[in-house]
C-alpha cells in the first residue's frame, strides 16, 4: 500500500487482454493476451450437456482484435468532433450534441440524423444497468453520521435536488429517476409505480410525485438549520461538493447544483479537481458531498447492494462503498 501497488494500478486476471499502458489521465491500452486460454463468443443457442458447454459459435474465437485504446477527453465537444473525424470508433451523445446527432421520425422514435447516417454511423440504444447518485461522506461531522440532525439534513437536500430537471437538462431526457439502488433490468428494481422511494416521493391522486420544497424546509428546521442558519452558532450553513472535470458542461452542472441547494438556503461551495485527487479524497474520507456512480459487473442486485455493506467502506476497509 505504501508503494501504491494496488489492483487499481496493477490488475491481475486471466482475461483475453493485458493492460499494457495505464495512464488514466491520458490513455489506457489493452493488448491481446497471447496466453489466453481461448473462448468463443457466446450464443443463445449454446447448450450444456453433462456439465460441459457446447458452443454454437465455434469459429468466433475471442478476442476479435489485437489492441483497444481508451483515450481521455476532458471535454465533450472535442471528443464528439474527433469521433466524427474518425479518430474514435464509438462515442456517447452528449447533451450539447444531441440535436446534431438524433431526430424524431414520424412515429416519434429516435433515429440518427441523415448526416450521420451518410458517414456510416450506427445508433445503438439500450437501458444501461447503471446508477448515478449524489453521496454524503458518512464520516463527515455535518452531513454524516446516524444522528437525527444529520439524517434530516440529508433528507432535506434529497428533496431539494430536482433529478427530473437534471435528466431533462443534462441528459436530454435519457434517464430514469432512481427509486432504489437497483437499476432497471436487475431483479428487485423499483419502477416508481408500485414501489417507490417514500422518503422523497408521495402518492397523490393515484400518482407518485416528488414531495414539495416546503417539506424540505421543514426538515431543515428539524435538523437545526432553519432558513439555512445553524441554530447552535447562528452562522450560515456552508457545505462542500467535490467534483471532477474542467469542461463547460461540468461548470454548467455545478451552477445548477448550487441553485438546488439555494432552494433551502444552503450555501454550496464546489471544489473541482482531477479524478486522481478526487479518488484520494474518497479513500481518505476528506470529501463532504460528491457525485459518483456504479455500472453492473454482473446482472444481480447483490452487485449494487454490497456497496452499502459497512465492511465495504473505502476509508476503514478499502472497499468500494464511498
Question: What role is predicted for each listed range?
Answer:
Residues 17, 143-144, 176-223, 245-252:
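Structural transition elements
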Residues 20-31, 56-57, 69-140, 164, ...:
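Extracellular/periplasmic solute-recognition and catalytic clefts
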Residues 36-37, 140-153:
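Short helix-loop capping/hinge motifs at secondary-structure junctions, enriched
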Residues 35, 84-88, 106, 141, ...:
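Sec-exported extracytoplasmic/periplasmic mature domains
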Residues 117-123, 127, 151-155, 159, ...:
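Extracytoplasmic/peripheral linker and loop segments enriched in polar/acidic and small residues
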Residues 24, 43, 61, 69-78, ...:
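Ligand/substrate-recognition segments at binding pockets and active sites
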Residues 1-69, 77-78, 214, 218-219:
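Gly/Pro-rich hinge or "lid" segments in bacterial periplasmic/extracellular proteins
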Residues 66, 77-81, 85, 134, ...:
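Solvent-exposed, polar/charged alpha-helical surfaces in well-ordered, non-transmembrane soluble domains
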Amino acid at each position: 500500500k505504501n508503494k501504491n501497488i494496488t489492483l487499481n494500478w496493477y490488475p491481475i486476471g486471466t482475461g483475453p487482454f493485458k493492460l499494457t499502458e495505464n495512464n488514466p489521465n491520458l490513455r489506457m491500452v489493452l493488448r491481446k493476451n497471447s496466453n489466453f486460454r481461448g473462448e468463443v463468443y457466446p450464443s443463445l443457442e449454446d447448450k450444456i450437456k453433462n456439465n460441459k458447454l457446447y458452443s454454437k459459435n465455434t469459429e468466433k474465437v475471442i478476442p476479435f482484435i489485437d489492441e483497444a485504446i481508451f483515450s481521455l477527453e476532458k471535454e465533450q465537444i472535442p471528443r464528439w468532433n474527433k469521433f466524427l473525424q474518425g479518430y474514435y470508433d464509438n462515442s456517447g451523445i452528449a447533451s450539447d450534441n444531441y440535436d446534431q446527432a438524433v431526430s424524431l421520425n414520424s412515429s416519434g422514435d429516435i433515429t440518427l440524423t441523415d448526416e450521420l447516417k451518410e458517414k456510416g454511423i450506427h445508433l445503438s440504444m439500450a437501458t444501461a444497468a447503471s446508477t448515478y447518485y449524489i453521496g454524503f461522506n458518512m464520516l463527515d461531522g455535518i452531513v454524516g453520521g446516524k444522528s437525527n440532525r444529520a439524517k434530516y439534513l440529508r433528507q432535506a437536500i434529497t428533496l431539494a435536488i430536482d433529478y427530473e430537471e437534471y435528466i431533462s437538462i443534462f441528459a436530454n431526457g435519457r434517464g430514469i429517476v432512481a427509486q432504489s439502488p437497483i437499476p432497471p433490468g436487475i431483479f428487485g428494481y423499483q419502477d416508481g409505480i408500485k414501489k417507490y422511494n417514500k422518503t422523497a416521493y408521495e402518492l397523490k391522486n393515484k400518482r407518485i410525485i416528488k414531495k414539495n420544497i416546503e417539506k424540505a424546509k421543514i426538515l431543515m428546521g428539524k435538523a437545526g438549520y432553519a432558513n439555512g442558519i445553524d441554530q447552535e452558532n447562528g452562522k450560515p450553513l456552508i457545505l462542500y461538493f467535490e467534483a471532477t472535470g474542467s469542461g463547460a458542461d461540468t461548470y454548467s452542472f455545478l451552477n445548477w447544483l448550487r441553485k438546488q441547494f439555494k432552494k433551502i438556503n444552503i450555501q454550496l461551495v464546489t471544489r473541482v479537481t482531477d479524478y486522481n485527487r478526487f479518488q484520494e479524497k474518497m479513500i481518505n474520507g476528506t470529501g463532504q458531498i460528491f457525485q459518483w456512480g456504479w455500472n453492473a459487473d454482473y446482472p444481480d442486485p447483490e452487485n449494487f447492494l454490497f456497496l452499502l455493506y459497512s465492511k465495504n467502506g473505502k476509508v476503514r476497509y478499502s472497499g468500494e462503498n464511498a
